[in-house]
């Protein structure tokens, strides 16, 4: 949905022709005018009951024109992964940071990875893994960057039997390679 700045109305905007339907993808701001959408899992026709694939692509959405552009795709490696809710883009250092985790097991883990923002190349793993109970819609993880404290924060949440288990992890920024 988009809201008019001059009128009090909303308009539906569809990106399904430009970005294949997906979930378990990450999004974040590249700058004031650009939202990035990275990776995920879904079906190109939007019919997940027919099977899903993991996506390793990055899209940019201009929030002024609502135009979408595919920036890159990295080759599917043997270690399938999906992305936490938020991604962090560092234009100055040409890096895209994401919490990544395998979506094919429930006793999973999260790993902070970076990719070159302009190409998707030079995938780098950071720090150690974080234990993560993955149960589709009952769990999520997200990444935040605090520029004042120069910290990255990874937040995990797992809901089970009407109870939530929430964990917060911090890491100095910029992160060090493993």
Model region roles, listed by residue range:
Residues 1-54:
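N-terminal pre-first-transmembrane soluble regions of secretory-pathway and organelle membrane proteins
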Residues 1-9, 50-67, 107-122, 164-178:
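Beta-propeller blade signature
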Residues 21-24, 54, 81-85, 137-139, ...:
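Beta-rich catalytic cores
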Residues 29-33, 89-93, 145-149:
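Residue-level detector of Asp-centered blade-edge/turn motifs that repeat once per structural unit
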Residues 35-37, 96, 152:
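Hydrophobic beta-strand positions that form the internal "hydrophobic ladder"
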Residues 37-54, 98-109, 157-168:
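Short, conserved, GDST-rich strand-edge loop motifs in beta-rich repeat architectures
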Residues 67-85, 118-148, 177:
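Conserved blade-ending motifs and adjacent loop-strand segments that build the rim/top face
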Residues 137-178:
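Blade-level signature of beta-propeller repeat domains, shared across WD40, Kelch, NHL, RCC1
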